[in-house]
Amino acid sequence: MTQEEQIRLYRLMEKLNWFFHQEMHYLDRETAEKTARECYPEIRNFTYDILWNDLPKEVQEQFTDEEESL
């Protein structure tokens, strides 16, 4: 992971921590929708591209096998 990606991930985690830290944030529909719209593209990118590509092949295969058994 590049330093730029690490910074992006840190900022994403900060935003998610802010959101989940106070129950009033996720109980407020407008705040929840805004946070979801802002965060989901980064979550998807990190999950399926950045972090996935950093995993060793054997770990990727393990996750793939687990998904197939669901």
Where are these regions (language model features)?
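Long, low-complexity or tandemly repetitive, helically biased scaffold regions used
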Residues: 28, 35-36, 43, 47, ...
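N-terminal acidic leader/helix
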Residues: 1-30
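Short intrinsically disordered terminal tails
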Residues: 1-4, 54-70
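Generic structural signal for well-ordered, non-transmembrane alpha-helical segments
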Residues: 10, 14-17, 37, 41-45
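Charged/polar positions within long, soluble alpha-helices
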Residues: 18-21, 25, 48-56
